[in-house]
Regions:
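N-terminal leader/targeting and accessory segments in enzymes
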Residues: 1-81, 85, 239, 268-270, ...
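ATP-dependent carboxylate-amine ligase
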Residues: 1-13, 24-30, 40-43, 108, ...
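Short, high-confidence coil segments that cap the C-terminus of an alpha-helix
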Residues: 53, 168-171, 367-368, 447
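Short acidic-hydrophobic, aromatic-tinged amphipathic segments that line or gate anion-handling sites
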Residues: 69-74, 258, 428-432, 436
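Phosphate-binding loop of NTP-binding sites
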Residues: 79-236, 240-253, 304, 310-313, ...
Length: 489
C-alpha cells in the first residue's frame, strides 16, 4: 500500500530518476534516506532538498518537518518497488563474478568474447561500466567520482545501469560482485543465469573479521542471486574448493562447472613468454589450442572461466573458441611496456596472493636480470596484516624492493611505509610514487624487469585525505622519455 501511494505521487510530480546521493540530487528526482553503517540518510535530507530533490522517502521521522518528506515503515521494500517502476528493464543475459582476485579480468574477457561474437555486451565493476558506446559509457559512469572506488555499485545504481543497458540494446552483461557488495545486499533481488568464483585468499578481514565470514559473503552470490536452474563456474585451484562445491551443489542446488585440473575445461599446457602465451586445453573430450598476447598464467584460467560463462548463457563453444586468440590485455592488469631489453609491468595486485602470483610468473619468464618491485600499502584493507604479508612476499621474490606511497586515505603514509619496512629492511624507501618509478627505471640494465603493483588502471591517488591525479603507466612513459630510454623501445 505504501508503495502504491508513493508511485502515484511520483507520477504526479513527474519524477523520472532516483538520486544516488543527496549531493547529486536534482529536480524531478526522489531521494531515499536509507539507514547506513555509521549515519542515517536523514542527516542528508537538507542537502538533497537544497539540490532540488522533489521527494524524500525515509523510515525515521526527521527532526524538522518537511512538506515533501514521507515516512514509511519498510523503506527497503518501497525502494525496490520504486526502482522496479522507474528502472524496470534488464539485459537478457546476466552473469556475475566473485573472488578475491580475477573478477575484473573475467568480466572484461566475457565482454570481449561477446563482442567478438557480434553481440552487444557490457562489463560492470572496478573499471566502471564498459561498452563500445562512448556516450553511454560517459552517462553511466558520471555518478562515480572515482570509478575504482566501488567494485559493486549500490542497488539503485546497478538497476539504473542495467535499465539503461537494456534500453540501448545490450543483451549480455557481466558484473563484479564484491564481498562488501554481497554482504551489504547491494544486489538484492537481481538474478543471474550464471556466476563464477575465481579465487579465494586473505583479504578484507578489517570488514569481515574472519575467513569463514569472508567466504560466506562470497557464497551469498550463489545462494541468493543465481536462478534455480543456473550455472556456477569455479576455479579448481581454490584451496577451499570442497567447501565451495558442497555449498553450491548440495545446499544451493546449482549445477557446478570448473576450470583447471580435472575440470570441465582442463588446461593441458601453457607455454608462456614475455610476448604472450600458447595454450592447450581440453573441453568435452576435444583438444583445442590458442595464443594470446596476454601475460600471466592466471589470466588463462580467467579467460576459460569467461568462456564457460558465455557458453552457458547461449553461445556456441565452436563459435567462441576460435575467437580466444583475439582477446586483448586489460588495462592495468600485467600491462607491459618494453624499453631495450628491459620490461616494466603495471598490475593491480592488491593482495599478498596476487603479488606472489605475478612475481613468481615474471621470474619464470626471465631469470637473466633483476626483478624490481614497487608497491605500497592502502588504507584500512586488513591494514597491518596485509602490509606485512605483502612486504614479506615482495622481499622473498624480488631482487630489489622499493616501498612507496599508494592510497593512504586518512592514515599517515609514513607510518604505512614503516610497517612494511619492518619486514623488508633491505627495501629502498621513496615516498613519492612517481619518483620511485623514476629511480627504478634509472637503475635498470639489460634483462631487468620492473613490477609496479597496487594501482593498475587507477587514475587517482589518495594521500592524507587529498585526491591527486595519478596513473602508474603514465609515470612510466613520462620517466622513460625524461631518461631517454623510450627511443630503445
Amino acid at each position: 500500500m505504501e508503495s502504491n501511494n508513493i508511485i502515484e505521487i511520483i507520477k504526479k510530480l513527474n519524477i523520472r530518476n532516483i538520486a544516488i546521493t543527496a549531493q547529486s540530487a536534482k529536480p524531478n528526482q526522489i531521494f531515499f534516506a536509507l539507514p547506513g553503517i555509521s549515519r542515517h540518510g536523514n542527516d542528508f535530507i537538507d542537502i538533497a532538498l537544497a539540490n532540488g530533490a522533489s521527494l524524500i522517502i525515509t523510515d525515521q521521522e526527521p527532526i524538522t518537518s518537511y512538506s515533501n518528506v514521507m515516512v514509511v515503515k519498510n523503506i527497503i521494500l518501497v525502494m525496490k518497488d520504486v526502482v522496479n517502476y522507474l528502472y524496470p528493464k534488464f539485459p537478457k543475459y546476466l552473469v556475475a563474478v566473485t573472488g578475491t582476485d580475477g573478477k575484473t579480468s573475467v568480466v572484461n574477457y566475457f565482454q570481449q568474447l561477446c563482442m567478438l561474437a557480434a553481440e552487444q555486451a557490457a562489463s560492470i565493476g572496478t573499471l566502471g561500466v564498459i561498452t563500445t558506446n562512448n556516450h553511454l559509457n560517459k552517462l553511466l559512469n558520471q555518478n562515480k567520482t572515482k570509478p575504482e572506488c566501488a567494485t559493486t555499485m549500490s542497488y539503485i545504481q546497478t538497476r539504473y545501469v542495467l535499465h539503461q543497458l537494456a534500453t540501448n540494446g545490450i543483451n549480455f552483461v557481466a558484473l563484479e560482485a564484491s564481498s562488501h557488495g554481497l554482504d551489504q545486499n547491494r544486489l538484492m533481488d537481481i538474478k543471474f543465469q550464471a556466476a563464477a568464483f575465481t579465487s579465494f585468499s586473505r583479504d578484507h578481514l578489517d570488514y569481515h573479521k574472519t575467513m569463514n565470514k569472508y567466504l560466506d559473503a562470497k557464497l551469498k552470490l550463489f545462494k541468493e542471486n543465481v536462478v534455480s536452474d543456473g550455472i556456477a563456474v569455479v576455479n579448481n585451484n581454490i584451496n577451499e574448493l570442497s567447501i565451495i562445491q558442497s555449498k553450491i551443489t548440495d545446499e544451493f542446488g546449482l549445477k557446478l562447472l570448473s576450470v583447471e585440473q580435472q575440470g570441465d575445461i582442463q588446461i593441458i599446457d601453457v607455454q608462456s613468454s614475455l610476448n604472450g602465451q600458447k595454450v592447450h586445453f581440453r573441453y568435452k573430450n576435444s583438444d583445442y589450442k590458442f595464443e594470446v598476447s596476454i601475460i600471466g598464467r592466471v589470466h588463462i584460467t580467467n579467460i576459460l572461466i569467461a568462456l564457460l560463462l558465455a557458453v552457458n548463457v547461449g553461445f556456441d563453444s565452436a563459435k567462441l573458441i576460435p575467437l580466444l586468440s583475439n582477446l586483448k590485455p586489460i588495462k592495468g592488469r600485467m600491462e607491459k611496456i618494453q624499453f631495450g631489453n628491459c620490461y616494466a609491468f603495471v598490475d593491480y595486485a592488491l593482495t599478498p596472493n596476487a603479488l606472489a602470483t605475478m612475481l613468481t610468473e615474471l621470474r619464470t619468464l626471465n631469470n637473466k636480470g633483476r626483478l624490481i618491485t614497487i608497491f605500497g600499502g592502502s588504507e584500512n584493507r586488513d591494514a597491518i596484516a596485509r602490509r606485512v604479508q605483502m612486504g614479506i612476499v615482495a622481499s622473498k621474490l624480488s631482487d630489489l624492493v622499493i616501498v612507496t606511497d599508494q592510497d593512504s586515505g586518512n592514515e599517515d603514509p609514513a607510518a604505512i611505509r614503516k610497517e612494511i619496512l619492518q619486514v623488508a629492511p633491505s627495501a629502498v624507501e621513496i615516498p613519492n610514487r612517481g619518483e620511485a618509478i623514476k629511480y627504478a627505471i634509472s637503475i635498470m640494465v639489460d634483462n631487468d624487469m620492473l613490477l609496479i603493483a597496487g594501482k593498475g588502471h587507477e587514475t587517482r591517488q589518495v594521500l592524507k585525505g587529498r585526491i591527486i591525479n595519478y596513473n602508474d603507466m603514465e609515470q612510466v612513459k613520462l620517466h622513460l622519455k625524461q631518461l631517454n630510454k623510450m627511443s630503445n623501445q
